[in-house]
A protein has these predicted regions:
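Nuclease catalytic cores
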Residues: 26-31, 46-50, 54, 58
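Basic/aromatic recognition patch in beta-strand/loop cores that engages polyanionic ligands
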Residues: 77-78, 83-88
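Nucleic-acid nuclease catalytic cores
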Residues: 101-145
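Conserved catalytic cores of phosphodiester-cleaving nucleases, focusing on short active-site segments
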Residues: 45, 68, 88-106, 117
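A short, surface-exposed helix-loop junction/capping segment
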Residues: 33-42
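Short, low-complexity, charge-dense intrinsically disordered segments
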Residues: 1-21
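A short acidic/basic microdomain associated with nuclease active sites
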Residues: 62-77
Length: 145
């Protein structure tokens, strides 16, 4: 599997290979989502609940004319049987999974969570955005499958 994780100028293609880039290539939709999150953070800053940031992101995405779904239920199959479901924060334009956080620091389980969401949705791009960051750009990670 070719998993790409970007954070702080690095992009990981696998667990053993790390490539550092000054500027990671992003698509226009990803840039628009990040711009919306920056606007939310600029207006309200860190320290709110994740659910509040989700509502504010929905407003910004609407203002930007970007289609999205909130709180999307994703079935979890096992051997052909449904064993449960996950609830995604946002799916944008049926292309990008956006998982919002308001936490002190990123935990490795968040990376596993978004990678699982990408696999379950068959989508290739995910954004993990932690609004509880002093500088939001330090709280954004991009994932590629």
């Amino acid at each position: 599997m070719n998993t790409g994780i970007s954070h702080g100028g690095t992009e990981t293609r696998s667990k053993t290979e790390v490539k550092t880039r000054i500027s990671l290539p992003t698509d226009p939709l990803t840039e628009k989502i990040i711009a919306c999150s920056m606007e939310v953070h600029r207006r309200v800053g860190p320290g709110l609940l994740e659910s509040i940031y989700e509502s504010e992101m929905a407003i910004e995405l609407e203002f930007a004319g970007i289609k999205f779904q909130k709180q999307v239920l994703i079935p979890i199959p096992y051997r052909g049987r449904l064993v449960g479901e996950h609830r995604l924060d946002l799916i944008v334009e049926n292309k990008i999974v956006v998982e919002l956080k308001s936490v002190e620091r990123f935990d490795p389980v968040f990376e596993a969570q978004i990678l699982t969401y990408l696999k379950l949705t068959n989508l290739k791009v995910g954004l993990l955005i932690n609004f509880n960051s002093r500088r939001l750009k330090d709280g954004i990670r991009r994932f590629l499958l």
